[in-house]
């Protein structure tokens, strides 16, 4: 009888853990579309962003126009960065 009680208790705990894990996963999936919608709205509110063209100085890659990256140009000490293909 004691073994049966322990077995039922263990089964209940395992089932509870499974149900809680499933509900957390569902909440995460529901939250994801809202995050993307927030990012899209934020981008629209900022408007069209001017990008830095090839050969012009930059500080980081996101400011460069598409297909360009902010790379060191010139001396081995890397004192000047510019947008390059």
Curated annotation (Swiss-Prot):
Compartments where found: Secreted
Record carries keyword Disulfide bond: yes
UniProt keywords, alphabetically: Disulfide bond, Pyrrolidone carboxylic acid, Secreted, Signal, Toxin
Domain of life where this protein originates: Eukaryota
Expressing tissues: Expressed by the venom duct.
Family note: Belongs to the conotoxin O2 superfamily.
The name this protein goes by in its record: Conotoxin Mi15a
């Amino acid at each position: 009888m004691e073994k049966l009680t322990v077995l039922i208790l263990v089964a209940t705990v395992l089932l509870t853990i499974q149900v809680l894990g499933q509900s957390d996963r569902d909440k995460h999936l529901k939250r994801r579309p809202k995050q993307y919608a927030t990012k899209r709205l934020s981008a629209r509110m900022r408007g069209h962003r001017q990008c830095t063209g090839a050969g012009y100085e930059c500080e980081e890659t996101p400011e460069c126009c598409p297909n360009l990256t902010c790379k060191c140009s010139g001396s081995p000490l890397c004192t000047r960065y510019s947008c390059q293909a």
